[in-house]
Curated annotation (Swiss-Prot):
Name this polypeptide is given: DNA polymerase III PolC-type
InterPro entries: DNA_pol3_alpha_NTPase_dom, DNA_pol3_finger, DNA_PolC-like_N_II, DNA_PolC-type_N_I, DnaE2/DnaE/PolC, DNAPol_HHH, DnaQ, Exonuclease_RNaseT/DNA_pol3
Catalytic reaction annotation: DNA(n) + a 2'-deoxyribonucleoside 5'-triphosphate = DNA(n+1) + diphosphate
Exonuclease domain mapped to chain residues: 426-582
Lineage: Bacteria, Bacillati, Bacillota, Bacilli, Lactobacillales
């Protein structure tokens, strides 16, 4: 505690005997200000940890009351070192913030008290109706609350606002209903008034002309609508009547209100802005009239613009609407004279481009282009979709990428000689220029220091008049003004004098390529010899000598080494500072590496990974043939795996090695040909261009940002550069291709790229600000839309008609013709080779079948095996089965069960070889002694587990029962040729070992994690738009924000990996035959490489194993370890276990005690609120009915609005409704339908296609079902289903669930120990160990919060835990306290009928700290709290919490031995 803070506590009478004093005494006063005139004090306090709320309020009250008593005011701000905050503490501080703002902003308090607030993980989420959210909360209140929280130390808390859609909808309907009723009332009153007037007035004489009829009026109205003036949306900023818009519908939502009215909300854009629109329809008949309101249509609309009170934005209430035609851009050139785009990006160019590859190819095909190239930045992730789309569209896709080309090694010394570093004389120089181009910009200062042995022996400093006024940017950057250069020596004289000054010396510059390049360009221009003596680049010297430094610029280096740099960017100061650094480097390179000679710097200091710091240059690479495709895949892989540094880099030597089959283009303004031309002129550019197969030129508009960057003077200079590029190509007889650098399709799409790019922040090179201060802005982005041939010819019209046609059309077509069609995605499945895989699968299958069912096999078994093996072996699937079997077997040997997912349990072969426990045969009896069996094939039982117990008719042994009646067709299709997708649930604890098993079985070079591509999500896109709006002073109405967010969403943002998917490449091929590889999320330290392609793009070509982690196998293993009971011995038809699904008696409690009428709390598959409700409605009594429930709960539109209603109305029972997908096929075959038709109906229904297929096809199925007496309710039920769960998946899950349930009934303490150790997500030890009353009270508290929509996610998780805690306590078991010497790190401990919680259950104590604490106590007893903190790794807050809970007993703060710690 600082003395000042100690004095303050004393003055405000802070009680020193309170526990709060021990917490607050770590504080200090950082600063204090006194405003005497106002008698106001302002403190800045600092604390190590966030104060507990009790301590904070005590301090706050005493501070204010003390100053109030002196007639003074006090305010303060708190800084906290460790801002770790638990749930309850954050809630307390949030309430404090509301109370603070209550007096000055009462509306905040009243508003927040009626809104849903969720608090968790240092974040606060406010749920509010849309009309409050957009204006009041976000703009006014959130910032105020954040300020209060920041002042008390919670500067890291994020506050977000989420729309409460249910509340928004209710309010909006109420508003509209009220508005309609008011309108109807007004109309009624008007009619009554009119009728009264008519009745009281004399009847007028008949008119000579006839009154217009309704049809005439309507036609006039339509005519006026058709001829009405169209208003641009951007011009409408207030309420107006009878406005007419034309635009594109980009979003439609339709819903029916409680009163039966239909509201159509849709959004329209004319690309100047967007509007939300609304049309109310009285019923479904009227709805037909508005069929044109569909996403993608162009419409003309007329209506009234009103301010919507819910969204607080202008909305059009539509009166008239009609669909209109819209003519998209077309390519106007004749057939055969259309260009090929060779430089186009898709949304797979990370955070840089907008169109999907499908949109790009569709546009090219629509325009009649013969081909189009894909050149995303450094990746080929759009290739698979582009390949399939091009085939479908009938257009050639040219596959390429825009690579980041780097030099292999960047030298430190140019023109090196054999010189001793310490003996040489150096001229350390720097130049200042009007820009970065040695061709287009001028020298304005040359300064140098001649140095020998660390001393300056002579200096050179001359300004140069460029002959024109310096730009404000140049002056701002360099500090050089027109007055500096006015009257300076002529350039040629300065150059000559400088050459004389440099004679006999080694030249030195920081980033020497720039300075030397500028000097040589000017020497050449004036016929002077170019630099030939050695040149040291101190930038590269520093990069190689100090690779651990992140920054090697002149500023950071001078600061690090304490070298003065008073005026950075004035040449004389920069040169002297560079010289001082040089001699530090010479000293360090000798001390670190023993290097003394100039030549050694390149040969011994330049590292092999100097490419990491090398400047990246773009080059476009194109696949010319199949060899080129594989080589490109290798290059992409190497750039991501071996040469990744910030971006994926390709060293030139690597490109040379794999260049076969690849065409190399010179790329854009970031390519080295363009850069050399700009910086050094045509001659040097010709030398560089020799490396490339063709030269790219782009429309002048693409290069326009270079003007803003002061790299090029004007548009005329751009046109000259393009002509110079053509000259470079002509000298080398290389073709010139005009390319568009496409980043979006249409000109109006530019805003989408603008938003995406600006979201990268100023740290991104493309967003580097031009200028300084408030006016600094990034350079504008180029106009990079996809241009038609005629648009491209217009861009290059300045070259003349013939030359423009040559580079735009003729050369691009000729280059496209040189490129062969390639196969990007293979047609077939290529599985790995395992010796004798087919024989092994067949042998294992029959061996197990003989063991269980006897030899010879029953016909039904024999035929099923023969059928399955014919498919599995005939289609090359044996290796997939065998690999899965090997993985499952290895996990079993480690002591874990493995659960199957999906439909693999439909395969009897999979059952026999041990991949799945699910037996798909019809229900049957099986004798474990003599192998006799009896099969029930009439459909009377849905599961063999439900068969009544029975003794073997042959030997009298009690039969085993099995069989779930699942057809094989549901796994591999009716013809058995569908690639098997075997998903397996391994224990989460064993999952890493299972992953490594794949490597072990197939080889590390053949096993890769399944890659994923992360794109900009909808909510993120919305945030990008709002951020752009804020940062660039824009204003968009809500509909326009939504439109822009939709345009931005879907752009690639990062890469990742599937949580359990592993792709296996066949060992007779290599991975580059299918995909490049990389590390997930560009993390080169990751343990696994991933497929570069999204794994879904190649999942039909290679084996993919889903090795997922799951809690069920972990929990089963825990229960087995606790009890010694083999889970495989647990019967699936235990009568006591089945009682859980119909009541609570088997647990020894009443429904009132545990708050639910069944005993399924905490049982996998059945313990959620939703499924518990289903259980309570249906009371299942058989395994088959549990399968039904599992299917019903996982399906979409299978239970709600479907089976639930059928059961309630008594039309069907739980047993007869459609539950799992396989049941449809089995039921229909039992009914008499042809198996093929039964299978097809099942497939149509399970995928939600029943109502989407043609009416003719559907009626054929209905007729067949009715002919076989399938009831109408069953047929109608099929039509409602959107998705169905596989029965095999349900069976695997239910079998696991019943094993867990067995322990809950028969070995409850083991069950609760396992549940809390593995499944529980949240704990509150104080409540859990305080007894039943405390638990029930806390549950009631959370229930009330839930009703007010105020319960946090953590509280919702805690409620689930407390339900099980309550049940456990009601059954007579208890929770003990944490015990410093008994508690485990992560798992609960059984002590009689009591569970001792682990350390991890203590709020704020993580797994690593818990393990450290357990390890520390093994070393010896903790003698003091200080020792506990140090050895156990606990924070002061955690130690205090343990102390408050009574866990530390009378442990002293310090022990005597600790007094001597500081001496060691």
């Amino acid at each position: 505690m600082s003395d000042k803070f100690k004095l303050l506590l004393k003055q405000i009478h802070f009680p020193q005997h309170e526990e709060a004093y021990n917490e607050i005494k770590s504080g200090s006063i950082e600063s204090v200000k006194l405003f005497k005139s106002k008698r106001q004090w302002f403190f800045v306090f600092s604390f190590r940890n966030l104060l507990s709320y009790e301590t904070f309020t005590l301090f706050d009250n005493l501070l204010h009351s003390s100053f109030d008593s002196l007639g003074a005011k006090v305010s303060y701000m708190i800084n906290v070192e460790d801002i770790s905050c638990d749930q309850s503490l954050l809630e307390a501080y949030f309430s404090y913030a509301l109370d603070i703002l209550k007096s000055s902003h009462f509306s905040i308090y009243s508003l927040f008290s009626n809104l849903g607030i969720e608090i968790s993980n240092n974040s606060i989420s406010v749920k509010a109706p849309a009309h409050i959210l957009r204006e009041n909360l976000h703009e006014r209140f959130i910032a105020l609350i954040a300020d209060v929280l920041s002042n008390v130390g919670l500067s890291n808390v994020s506050i977000s606002v989420l729309e409460d859609k249910e509340a928004s909808s209710s309010l909006e309907e109420a508003y509209e209903t009220n508005k309609i009723s008011l309108q109807e009332e007004a109309e009624s009153q008007a009619r009554q008034a009119l009728q009264s007037i008519v009745q009281s007035s004399p009847v007028p004489p008949p008119q000579k002309h006839q009154a217009q009829n309704f049809a005439e009026k309507q036609s006039q109205r339509v005519a006026s609508f058709d001829k009405a003036e169209i208003t641009p949306m951007i011009e409408v900023n207030s309420e107006e009547n009878r406005i007419v818009f034309e635009g594109y519908i980009f979003d439609v939502e339709q819903r029916e209100t409680k009163t039966g009215r239909i509201i159509i909300n849709f959004k329209v854009t004319d690309y100047t802005s967007s509007f939300a629109m609304q049309r109310w329809v009285k019923d479904s008949e009227e709805l037909v009239k508005f069929g044109m309101i569909k996403k993608g249509n162009w419409v003309r609309v007329r209506g009234r613009i009103e301010n919507n009170p819910f969204t607080h934005s202008l909305t059009m209430n539509v009166q008239d609407i009609k669909e209109i035609s819209h003519t998209p851009r077309k390519d106007l050139m004749p057939e055969g004279q259309k260009r090929v785009e060779f430089h186009a990006h898709t949304n797979m160019s990370t955070m840089d481009a907008i169109p999907t590859v499908e949109e790009l190819i569709d546009t090219a095909a629509f325009w009649g282009h013969p081909a189009v190239a894909i050149t995303d930045h450094a990746n080929v992730q759009s290739f698979p979709h582009g390949y399939h789309k091009a085939k479908k569209a009938g257009i050639k896709a040219i596959f390429g990428l825009e690579a980041n080309l780097v030099e292999d090694k960047v030298p430190i010394v140019y023109n090196s000689e054999n010189l001793e570093l310490k003996e040489a004389t150096y001229v350390v120089f720097d130049v200042e220029t009007t820009g970065l181009s040695a061709v287009h910009n001028d020298l304005i200062q040359i300064a140098a220091s001649k140095m020998h042995k660390g001393n300056i022996v002579e200096q050179f400093d001359e300004f140069i008049d460029p002959g024109y006024p310096l730009s404000a940017f140049t002056t701002e950057l360099t500090g050089i003004t027109d007055n500096h250069v006015k009257g300076a020596k002529p350039l040629v004289q300065v150059l000559q004098e400088f050459q004389e000054f440099c004679k006999g010396a080694v030249l030195v510059a920081h980033n020497a390529t720039f300075d030397v390049g500028f000097m040589n360009a000017n020497y050449e221009r004036h016929q002077l010899p170019t630099i030939s003596q050695p040149v040291i680049d101190t930038l590269e010297f520093a990069r190689n000598l100090y690779p651990e430094y992140k920054r090697h610029g002149l500023g950071p280096l001078t600061k690090r080494f304490g070298v003065a740099l008073d005026h950075h960017h004035m040449a004389n100061y920069d040169a002297e500072a560079t010289g001082r650094l040089l001699f530090i480097f010479i000293k360090d390179v000798f001390e670190k590496h023993g290097l003394t000679n100039l030549e050694q710097l390149n040969t011994e200091l330049v590292s092999d990974d100097s490419y990491k710091k090398s400047r990246v240059k773009h080059a476009t690479l194109y696949v010319q043939n199949q060899t080129g495709l594989k080589n490109l895949f290798k290059l992409v892989s190497l750039s991501n795996v071996s040469y990744f540094e910030g971006v994926a880099r390709i060293p030139r030597k690597v490109l040379d090695e794999y260049r076969e089959g690849i065409i190399v283009g010179s790329a854009c303004a970031d390519g080295e040909v363009f850069d050399t031309l700009l910086s050094h002129g045509i001659d040097k550019a010709v030398e560089v261009a020799k490396y490339y197969d063709f030269i790219e030129v782009m429309p002048p508009a693409i290069y326009a940002p270079l003007i803003a960057k002061d790299l090029i003077k004007d548009e005329g200079a751009i046109e000259q550069l393009i002509k110079d590029l053509i000259e470079v190509a002509n000298r080398l007889d290389k073709p010139v291709l005009a390319t568009g650098n496409v980043h979006y399709i249409n000109p109006e799409d530019a805003i989408y790229r603008e938003i995406i790019v600006r979201a990268l922040g100023q740290g991104a090179m493309i967003n580097r600000p031009i200028g300084k201060g408030e006016n600094a802005q990034p350079a504008p982005l180029p106009e990079a839309h996809f241009r038609t041939t005629n648009e491209m010819l217009d861009e290059f019209a300045f070259l003349g008609k013939d030359l423009a046609y040559e580079i735009v059309v003729a050369n691009t077509q000729a280059m496209a013709n040189q490129i062969e069609e390639v196969e990007v995605v293979k047609k077939d499945l290529y599985t790995p080779y395992i010796d004798r895989a087919e024989e092994q699968v067949a042998e294992m299958t029959y061996a197990k079948a003989f063991e269980l069912y006897g030899n010879p096999l029953p016909d039904i078994i024999d035929l099923r095996i023969e059928k399955e093996l014919s498919s599995i072996l005939g289609n090359g699937f044996a290796v997939i089965y065998l690999a899965s079997q090997m993985l499952v077997n290895r996990s079993n040997e480690r002591g874990y069960l493995v659960g199957s997912r999906g439909s693999v349990g439909s395969s009897f072969v999979a059952t026999m070889i041990g991949i799945t426990e699910v037996n798909p045969m019809p229900p049957h009896y099986l004798c474990p002694k003599c192998q006799h069996s009896e099969f029930i094939t009439d459909g009377s039982y849905g599961s063999g587990f439900d068969l009544p117990d029975k003794e073997c008719s042959e030997c009298g042994t009690e039969y085993k029962k099995d069989g779930q009646d699942i057809p094989f067709e549901t796994f591999l299709g009716f013809d058995g040729d569908k690639v098997p997708d075997i998903d397996l649930n391994f224990s989460g604890d064993d999952q890493p070992s299972a992953h490594l098993d794949v490597r072990d079985i197939f080889g590390e070079q053949y096993a890769f994690r399944a890659g994923t591509v992360g794109t900009v999500a909808d909510r993120t896109a919305y945030g990008f738009v709002k951020g752009y709006e804020r940062d660039y002073n824009k204003f968009y109405r809500d509909a326009e924000v939504d439109r822009l967010a939709m345009g931005v969403a879907g752009v690639k943002r990062n890469t990742g990996q599937h949580p359990g998917g592993i792709v296996v490449i066949p060992n007779y091929m290599d991975v580059y035959d299918f995909t490049p590889v990389q590390y997930p999320a560009d993390d080169v330290t990751a343990a696994w490489q991933t497929t570069h392609f999204n794994f879904h793009d190649i999942d039909e070509n290679v084996l993919k194993l889903d090795i997922l982690g799951h809690d069920d196998p972990t929990m089963i293993r825990k229960l087995q370890d606790l009890s010694g009971i083999d889970p495989k011995d647990i019967r699936a038809d235990d009568p006591d276990v089945m009682k859980l699904f119909s009541g609570t008696e088997v647990l020894g409690v009443t429904p009132e005690q545990i708050g639910t009428s069944t005993g399924v709390l905490g049982i996998p598959e059945f313990g959620t609120n939703f499924v518990r409700g289903m259980v309570e409605e249906t009371h299942p009594t058989t395994f088959a009915e549990l399968l039904q429930l599992s299917g019903l709960s996982h399906g979409t539109d299978v239970w709600l609005g479907n089976a639930q209603d059928l059961i309630k109305e008594g039309i069907a029972t739980l047993k007869t409704v459609i539950g799992c997908r396989d049941d449809i096929m089995v039921y229909l075959m039992h009914a008499g339908l042809d198996p093929k038709m039964a299978f097809t109906i099942m497939e149509r229904v399970r995928k939600g296609m029943w109502l989407k297929i043609s009416e003719e096809e559907r009626n054929g199925y209905i007729q067949a079902m009715r002919e076989n007496n399938v009831p109408d309710w069953y047929i109608e039920s099929c039509g409602k289903i959107k998705y169905m769960f596989p029965k095999a998946h349900a069976a695997a899950y239910v079998m696991m669930a019943l094993r867990v349930a067995y322990f809950k009934v028969h070995h409850p303490i083991y069950y609760y120990c396992a549940y809390f150790s593995i499944r529980a997500k949240a704990f509150e030890l104080k409540t859990m160990s305080a007894g039943l009353d405390a638990v029930k009270a806390r549950m009631e508290d959370i229930k009330e919060k839930r009703q007010r929509n105020e319960a946090t996610n953590l509280e919702n998780d805690l409620f689930t835990t407390l339900e099980i805690v309550n049940e456990m306590l009601e059954r007579g078991f208890t929770f003990g306290q944490l015990d410093l010497y008994k508690s485990q790190a992560t798992e609960f401990l059984i002590e009689g009928d009591t569970l001792i919680p682990p350390f991890i259950a203590l709020e704020g104590l993580g797994e690593n700290v818990a393990k450290q604490l357990v390890a520390a106590r093994e070393e010896g007893e903790f003698l003091s709290k200080t020792e506990l903190r140090k050895r156990g790794g606990l924070s002061s807050t955690l130690v205090e919490r343990l102390d408050e809970m009574g866990i530390l007993g009378n442990m002293p703060e310090d022990n005597q031995l600790s007094l001597f710690d500081d001496f060691f």
